[in-house]
């Protein structure tokens, strides 16, 4: 974590020199390291999953968080729990880890990856009011499914919508 924060600090300094308006990380695994660097800069630092998490907290009491890698699931769950606590709301968070899907992805077997993610996603529809896909690579599965019965949140979609709102203000 220390190395991540030091590396992120270097990137933040580069972003400042480039006169950027915002520094955003698209990787949940380093989101906490990015947050830890906020004290050192007036530049706005953000996580791509921030909007997704806030929207999920607003949309439902039972939140399922799906991931294919434990190193993404844990920091995402920590972040969701922290944001739930800050909101003052009561939410049940159900983690679902599908490591077999990640192994298939590494092996280049996209069909198996997508099938496992699709099955995991569909299994949550009866136990969650809203589902969060913790990795952008999982969002492609949504194109292969009929319209889900509950909202399914992805960080690229929510994050870009948030950035667009920020840019327009």
Segments the model singles out, each with a brief description of its role:
Residues 1-169:
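Non-catalytic structural scaffold of enzyme domains
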